[in-house]
Amino acid sequence: MAARTRLSLLLPQNLPRFGHLKLVHTEAVAKEPAYPPIVPSLTAKSNSARRRQIEEQVKKISASPVEEKLSLITRIQRLKFVVYPQTFARNADKWYQHLTKTAYVPGLPEKSAQDAKTVGDDAFADIRSLVTRVILHEHLQTRKRKPFLYRHQEQLVGPFLKNLVIALTHSLAKYNPVLQRSSLDISPQVNFYWRRGKRIIPKGHRRGRPEPIRFQIDDNPHSQIRITEQLPQFAPLEASYSAEVPEITLAPNLMPLFRRQYENNIFTGAKLPDPACYGHTQFHLVPDRFHRDRMSREQQSDQVEVFLRANGLASLFAWTGAQAMYQGFWNHEDVTRPFVSQAVITDGHFFSFFCYQLNTVALSVETDANNPRKNILWGTESLRLYESVEDKEVVGLNDAVIKLLVQFLMNQP
């Protein structure tokens, strides 16, 4: 039987020390995975599967051409809130600012007034006489019968605005070459569809699931001018970071807005291959129910400008947003440059002027979380073009309104 020996725990004196040894850190060799990564199922009924379905759909839309992209975005039809540009809801402009993430700035942008080319005194005198002739023509030389019920603006003021727009566009084309290559649409149709906010489905077989809140604008301006080149921005994108947008926590049906289910549309007034794909200026007529005197008698004078602001905001947001969609931008691919448009709203006597700059179309809950951009609307108060027509003369013709019309139409890239 072998004898057991006791080993000493102390190091022997003759062993070398560790001080002269250097430890070298070597990187571990990264091994390629032998199997593909584990991803959630596309068919399972789980939150992870739903997230993967959304990611795959976003990749598919982003890789598609513009025409197919618009079809994929508007393909699924659900109940959506229909936003009417001309609404008599109280304080509708605040609601529309929240739904479109738009900040309102009183007055017109300074850059627009500085960059706009001006016409000479002789040319302005010709334009002033032209506006006078158009007004006198509608009052003295046009045979007018009594209009149908609730069609006074369409049948009496509509022809005046049409003649005014055509005459001014034709006269200023010699000073603004962009108007020579422009396209003038009469009674066009403009549509825009977007998502903003989310809700929990209260009932039905989809009860308890989160759902984005959908909105649709179907607008019918009196006329609009489209051009082949994009108008310059009124302000840099970074200028919108500090703008304030009203925050409304109430549901849209309390405005009130009503939900309908029909085809989702995104349309600028022209088809996708049209070279005049950028907006210049829209012209709108107020409805027959809009009476300044009646609203004053009902102690709603403060809602006159609210109505006009809401109209300008919704119409320009729909038109400018559709232009951005035509260029391939959408909710998950935000705009890389601002899109701008202008609008004029009138009842034949009073004119309101608005400028809109679209800085973002990422309005859904997922894309708006860390998005400091905001859209901006500039607008003026109502300005009266003339007082009346007496003895074949226009009384009180306002040169400031004519100058603003010229300034809008002289805007060019």
Short names for language-model regions:
Residues 2-304, 379-413:
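Charge-rich, low-complexity intrinsically disordered linkers/tails
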Residues 296-365:
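Internal, well-ordered interaction modules that form the hydrophobic cores of assembly/scaffold domains
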Residues 352-389:
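Polybasic, proline/glycine-rich intrinsically disordered low-complexity segments
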